[in-house]
Amino acid sequence: MSLRPVYIRAISSLGAEDPDFRQLFSPLEARRMGRLLKRAVWTSRRALESAGLAMPDAIVTGTDFGSMIQSEAFLGALKQGGDATPRPTNFMQSTHNTIGSLIAIQLGCHGYNATYSHKGNSFRSALQDAWMQISLGDIDTALVGWFDEAFAPVGSSDKAVSVVLTASPEGAMGTYEALLGTLLES
């Protein structure tokens, strides 16, 4: 069996500054989402728009630490007042797979969805998973993301990168192999 080539069709990323999320989320939606989730959905939608793709076959995300701010808020409330006081939103948003799940819910995507949480190897693992599935012919497109927030106690920094991988060379920026080093440096 020969492997199919894999191409990068679009990349979207955010620096430390946030865009105007009101363009994408209603006030009610925005209140229920932490900053990390807003940034993840934002870059994912922008990458898909840039790629001219409405729905990927798979969503694969990587996060070094997940939403540490939500985890800290949940555990702090639990410590302060026992199990009666924590906000459920803080707990739900503290799990690492919440990022990929929310992107899938927002898009209505019912395909393959996986999250990698391996500290410095998370994004590489997510890219490898998507590359393998496309090159083997299991899927044709994948939305791959790397999302983290600045949290001093663990030395993490803001990351919001979304990449659309595809089996089709049409509209591609280049091959996966040619651009891999650039992606991992972002």
Residue ranges and their predicted role:
Residues 1-112, 117, 121-125, 132-139, ...:
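Conserved "HGTGT" condensation-loop signature of ketosynthase/thiolase-family condensing enzymes
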